[in-house]
């Protein structure tokens, strides 16, 4: 990309993002007016404890899988950190990342917590980069298979047709395979970006990245599937979640608030009532976003209190 093309892209990126965001607000407002809120309240009240516990268990599994991204990072940087040190950092970072944006959770929180464990700034950046790669290459591999298989049928009138979605899926599969091929066959294994050396992982590590990343997205979909009407198929719910993730990234809204709901209702309102869909998504927000954030906040305050106690202990009288 030339400098002229790059500057033109930057100039148009913000207006296009704002326009997309406004479009989603209009869409969600129109949908909200057509939703039977009495049905939403009734559906929320009708949830069985067994259903909520299953969703909570799947949420815990998802957070543990995401925290394991940093275990790959430990191997990547070659620093002897214990899993008991890494998993809490991954859990806390993910909870803050989901609710307060990647800058707060993915970046700031990881830098603060890992620096307390004696990890250098360069190695923290490598762990962060590998975690992002694990998440999004896993997404591309899974979305590629789901989209290209035709499991998701786009409603009439949508800008992206089912055929176009299948084409996007095929492209994502090719990108995923290209990443694996690069990890196996590339002769150049290292690059320097702003003074930080980035090393291409081994094929084994790359396969583990794709597997864990795809598993986490699958578990997220399983939580939503558990809370939505029973007549919906899991592959369809998974596909819609993967589509909504793209919209969430484009808008940069923390937690994708409103975006997830607009996409799910827009794509599934012909399969189930809008009220039942929104009720399930509200329950999903509470179980997958709010509850883990509260737990992560307590964990983080505990880490800070422990660090403060150690500083006081080391300070001479």
Model-assigned labels for residue ranges:
Residues 113-123, 239-240, 244, 262-277:
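Interfacial segments of multi-pass membrane proteins
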Residues 94-104, 132-144, 148:
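Mid-bilayer segments of alpha-helical transmembrane spans in multi-pass integral membrane proteins
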Residues 95, 130-133, 246, 286:
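Transmembrane alpha-helical cores of Major Facilitator Superfamily
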Residues 34, 81, 99-100, 104, ...:
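Residues at alpha-helix boundaries and short interhelical turns
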Residues 84-88, 102, 107, 116-133, ...:
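Membrane-interface alpha-helices at helix entry/exit sites of multi-pass transporters
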Residues 1-91, 139, 148-249, 274, ...:
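Predominantly cytoplasmic-facing regulatory/coupling regions of multi-pass membrane proteins
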